Amino acid sequence: SAYGSEKGIHDLHNQGFPLVMVNRFQPEDVGKIETISVDNYHAGYDATRYLIRTGHKRIAFAYGREELIFYRERYRGYCDALKDAGLPYDEHLVMRETSGAECFYHLTRALMELPQPPDAIFASSDPKAFVIMHALHDLGKRIPADVSVLGFDNVAMASMVEPPLSTMAQPFREIGATAAKSVIRQIRYKEEHGVLPPANSYVMAYDLIIRRSTN
């Protein structure tokens, strides 16, 4: 869970409980506790590069809770992609979560009132993208003619909203299967050796799903 207790997880691990951390972990956890994630940095980079390649110059970013490493890594990829393309970083184009995904409704409306509003918005999760699209619709903005919107996750609703959401897909089924196999491996190893095995770190593939919310 993205909202679990890291201290509780580390306490369980120190007591010898088999577990795996999915997406939410710190760099120092790698090699100590089993971890699974997509390459969030390169996914954020590639998402931003896609928007740049399709002609966008003013790309906003919807940032999630900054204490969560996967949001930080997606943001870092966004920043580096802008830099490598020679586009200026503009703090005014970064919307920061204050009270859950619903806060992005008002943040998006404020964003579009800028003298130079964005021509694309990269949301660090699909739920944020849905709220952003709602705000843009209410403002009379056309997606993607006026503003392209790109999400992250590829949750089921992404293909059902109007227009269907372009997004960076995480392989949720494979992540779940890998997590289950990891726990089983740890249980069997501990039964045989009395301790947990050396920790593995699994980095899963991501995929850009292009739908009609981007040009």
Predicted regions and their residues:
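Bacterial carbohydrate/catabolite-sensing allosteric modules
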Residues: E6-N215
